[in-house]
Amino acid sequence: MKSKALIVLGIALCLLAVSASIFAHHGAAAYDMTKTVTIKGKVTHFNFVNPHVQVFFAVTGDKGPEPWQAELTSPNHLVRTGWSKDTLKSGDDVTITGYRTKDGTNSIWIAKILLKDQELILATE
């Protein structure tokens, strides 16, 4: 009976550990959600994949193009608003408004995106 209790306890602890990491992944802790920034750039790559769609783009800075990365919600959410793997293409000019990472790296969580001055509708989680 004692060994069954230990097995159940072990399984419960494993499930607890896994669920904590899942919730941590979906948090916005890395982003400063108190300040929005707007950045203009040119799409270099568009990953329409789970768990989050990614947009890689170049921003022209004082020292030439700087690589940036932006995240969106899941493809499933975006499909519901008309997005597809072809919504953004390499070379597209975009204006992205969102929340930059707290550590200052060139990464942003997208709140709004303009493609050729047309706002793309985003699905929220």
Q: Residue locations for each model-derived region?
A:
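Short aromatic-glycine-enriched beta-strand elements
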Residues: V49-V59
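Short boundary/loop segments of OB/S1/cold-shock single-stranded nucleic-acid-binding domains
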Residues: F23-V37
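Cleavable N-terminal signal peptides
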Residues: I11-A12, I22
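Conserved hydrophobic positions within beta-strands
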Residues: G41-V43
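Bacterial N-terminal signal peptides that target proteins for export
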Residues: M1-G10
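Short nucleic-acid-contacting surface segments enriched for D/E, G, S/T with interspersed K/R
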Residues: R80-T95
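OB-fold/S1-family single-stranded nucleic acid-binding modules
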Residues: T101-T124
